[in-house]
Design a protein with these regions (language model features):
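Internal intein/HINT superfamily modules and their associated LAGLIDADG
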Residues: 1-228
């Protein structure tokens, strides 16, 4: 569709190919694109009860260690809102005492979450290293509200906010896990957003490592953390 003065138009492919881009006079050698398609509406999901609150699971997948039987999450202590994040995690658990404060290592506070070992094991997540993490199908097909909370938990940890100077803010997510990245991209699209995927391989600490990234553009703010 082409958009002129906030009006949607339906155009055939032949017409689009003729003038879909024009030269950018303010930046020689680059182009501006004349057409765009509107964001879709979110896809309805299932209202099946989830074993772990979606925000908590998102936070664990984003910044947690689940290679052992008890998940550990870390929250940066150089952010003013880290106590608020811990309080939010506690509010989403059946018992706030399940969150135990641990030590502070290199500017990050570590917390151990008790009582979720069985649930994580049933979801196939216990024992997963960073490169093996994934979003369980049950959560990908859950309700719109649950998917939004899951995405918020993921982005509140490893998400990066787009520039505030841009009219259309595009956030990004980076992970060592291709499966987790793919799941996040699916989440964004199922919520009516746009997401593109890419990857980058670098030589670091004596070996090659690959980061899997996706861009995120939504009609709403997907973050819950204030500083984001």
């Amino acid at each position: 569709s082409g958009k002129t003065k906030d009006r949607l138009r339906t155009l055939d492919t032949e017409t689009l190919l003729k003038d879909y881009k024009v030269e950018n006079k303010t930046a020689p050698g680059t182009f501006k694109y004349r057409y765009s398609t509107p964001l879709t509406v979110p896809i309805e999901g299932n209202y099946t009860k989830l074993p772990i609150h979606p925000y908590v699971l998102g936070f664990i997948l984003g910044d947690g260690c689940i290679s052992g039987n008890r998940p550990t999450v870390r929250v940066s202590t150089n952010r003013e809102d880290w106590p608020e994040i811990v309080d939010r995690l506690r509010s989403y658990l059946p018992d706030p005492n399940l969150v135990h404060e641990g030590t502070e290592v290199r500017g990050a506070k570590h917390f151990r979450i008790h009582g979720l070992g069985k649930e994580l094991k049933d979801l196939g997540l216990i024992g997963c290293k960073s490169k093996d993490k994934f979003i369980p199908e049950l959560y990908l097909k859950s309700s719109i509200e649950n998917r939004r909370l899951l995405l918020a938990g993921l982005l509140d940890t490893d998400g990066c906010v787009g520039s505030k100077k841009k009219i259309s803010k595009v956030s990004t997510y980076s992970s060592k896990s291709e499966h987790l990245r793919d799941g996040i991209s699916y989440l964004v699209r199922s919520l009516g957003g746009l997401s593109t995927k890419n990857e980058s391989t670098r030589f670091k600490y004596g070996r090659y490592t690959t980061s899997y990234m996706c861009s995120i553009r939504l009609a709403f703010n997907p973050f819950l953390r204030k500083y984001k």
